Amino acid sequence: ETTDLHMNLLSYDYYQDKTTDQYGLARAIALIKAARAEAPNSLLFDNGDLLQGNPMGDFVAKVSPLKDGQTHPAYRVMNQLGYDAANIGNHEFNYGLDFLRRSLKGANFPYVNANIYVADEHRNSDQARHAFTPYVLLDRQLVDAQGKTHAIKVGVIGFAPPQIMLWDKGHLEGKVIARDVLETARKYVPLMRAQ
């Protein structure tokens, strides 16, 4: 799992203007490949807070915004690594919903969020519409120690803190609402298990 990459794709500290060995997805690539070689029955997830966090993120969002059909640089790398699924983190909302949705189109893996809903006339009812896919069930084949293949389903669900409605009010107010994480999990986890 990766989390809180904050657009640190390269092993570079933009604030110090020098390379670093402390962070960066480029640095993690070797670790991910080694882990997969050691445990071929593995899955790769990202927990969010990917698109914002350093000058590269600002550049992609504000200076040279994505055009239709362009893939966000983070997703170019993640697609190559074969991520299985990802969660939308609170910082994904920092540049607004249009940028987020345009960026997500470039991901070749599912993104989930169960507690953010469209702010329409149904927002406070059971007919409320999700702003994003609430969860996915991944069908995977695993090989046991004897070489036998087993089909399994892996449920992936994601949440964002409801505080995004305060933190990114200018981008989100009147467009989406956030529901309680625990309440949402109690609703969807049993549904996922039943499938």
State the predicted function of each range.
Residues E1-Q195:
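Acidic, metal/ion-coordinating pockets
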